[in-house]
Amino acid sequence: MPSQAVFLVLTTVFSQCVGKFPIYTIPDKLGPWSPIDIHHLSCPNNLVVEDDGCTTLSGFTYMELKVGYITTIKVDGFTCTGIVTEAETYTNFVGYVTTTFKRKHFRPGPSACRDAYNWKAAGDPRYEESLHNPYPDSHWLRTVTTTKESLLIISPSVVDMDAYDKSLLSKIFPNGKCPGVSIASPFCSTNHDYTIWMPENTKTGMSCDIFTTSKGKRATKDGKLCGFVDERGLYKSLKGSCKLKLCGVSGLRLMDGSWVSIQNHEEAKWCPPDQLVNVHDFHSDEIEHLIVEELVKKREECLDALESIMTTKSISFRRLSHLRKLVPGFGKAYTIINKTLMEADAHYKSIREWSEIIPSKGCLVAGGRCYHHHNGVFFNGIILSPDGHVLIPEMQSALLQQHIELLESSVIPLMHPLADPSTVFKGDDGAEDFVEVHLPDVQKQISGIDLGLPEWKRYFLIGVAALTLFALTIFVVVCCRRVRRRERAKPNPVELIRKVSVTSQSGKVIPSWESYKVEAEGQSQA
């Protein structure tokens, strides 16, 4: 797509302004000037940025960001909370039943949460039944405790994913970040110990659908990779690139802000935290049309200026500005010294701020120093005004500033993994700390005899009962002793008959009633 190629060309390989975007190109290396004829003038090819000597091309396949990729990656998931419901039932003397419900929490397991979510998603009645309170049981003068464990599923719970380290961002996570989910750790801990977060789809829920596969050509020199030609035919140099992972995929961030899945570039180092990648959304397509028109216009202006030079056999400083190379790389620089057209080999670099090349009044930095002008003329149409100020024609381009603002707004505004190393992956994943809890059956526990009294009344009743029992014991013991005494004092009936004696009227002891009777009868007869 030509608009894409132009858009990427305009931002290719800028200077050492880390995290910045180019606004102008200036020679950082400028060869000796040599006179030329006007027939040697040519318009630069700004569609190609080539490295010298990289002429060996071979086909290969790579991945790059999709067109229309949106910066925020949403991941649908759900939260799972472990709930324990207790039903405490007490039955008093008269059979009155009192039931009290209590709720506690427990730490759920990922497998049980996945089962509960599947039940809820499928409309399985087992999920609703698992949330019901336990059916209370009762026993006379006893407290019956019935417990039931349930898993409460709340969905959807949408979180953001950081494309740089595939971590998850949400306020429900500790410190607002979760290192991510995997087979070993299929969940994220939350701010509550009894709640975990899991993705809805275990297979595609965490995949980054932001890449597209493209075909291009490797550019090598003596077997060393130095660049490649992308699918749109645009050459991209690997100079200044750095290693960067997107969604767990290793690749290179090129200095134009684009990202490709090239991994075998030995010289590349890991990107610093502020090196983000550019995105290409649909809104930028509208601006790209303006950029394409501007580039075509620049090309036409350069050709018109060149035609005018050839026709009139005359040249001006303004016309020379059209011959400047608009992208970093090797090119030509032109100037007029003592009314003679001069040419020099140059290597262009990008700048971000005008102050980089105009640090003070009358100073134009080129080649690492304030460049010496010749009668107020520098090169590429840059001149010195009568009041001593450096004048650059492109400084008046409003569209250029609009293009820079577009690039800045296209940076992925998410946290880079190197920005805060303490929040990235930790040594231990908390998966093993969780117990695999499947929804258990209702548990019932029956206590001993309980009168349903408060604590102090219970002890008071126990004391009264003990005293009563003690008094009753004493009473029984006393009664038993009295009975025993009576039994000991009462004589034997046989012995009583034998020992009975009666004293007669005469004063004589009679051993028995019969003897007394016989004696009494004898006295009466006498």
Swiss-Prot record:
Full protein name: Glycoprotein
Assembly and oligomerization: Homotrimer. Interacts with matrix protein.
- In its UniProt entry, the species of origin is given as Khujand virus (KHUV)
Report the locations given in the UniProt record: Virion membrane
Sites of S-palmitoyl cysteine lipid attachment are: C480
**Which controlled-vocabulary keywords does the entry list?**
Glycoprotein, Lipoprotein, Membrane, Palmitate, Signal, Transmembrane, Transmembrane helix, Viral envelope protein, Virion
An example of a Gene Ontology cellular component annotation for this protein is: viral envelope
Q: Which SUPFAM superfamilies does this UniProt record tie to the protein? A: Viral glycoprotein ectodomain-like
One Pfam family assigned to this protein is: Rhabdo_glycop_CD
Function summary: Attaches the virus to host cellular receptor, inducing endocytosis of the virion. In the endosome, the acidic pH induces conformational changes in the glycoprotein trimer, which trigger fusion between virus and cell membrane. There is convincing in vitro evidence that the muscular form of the nicotinic acetylcholine receptor (nAChR), the neuronal cell adhesion molecule (NCAM), and the p75 neurotrophin receptor (p75NTR) bind glycoprotein and thereby facilitate rabies virus entry into cells.
Intravirion topological segments: 481-526
Q: Does the keyword Lipoprotein apply?
A: yes
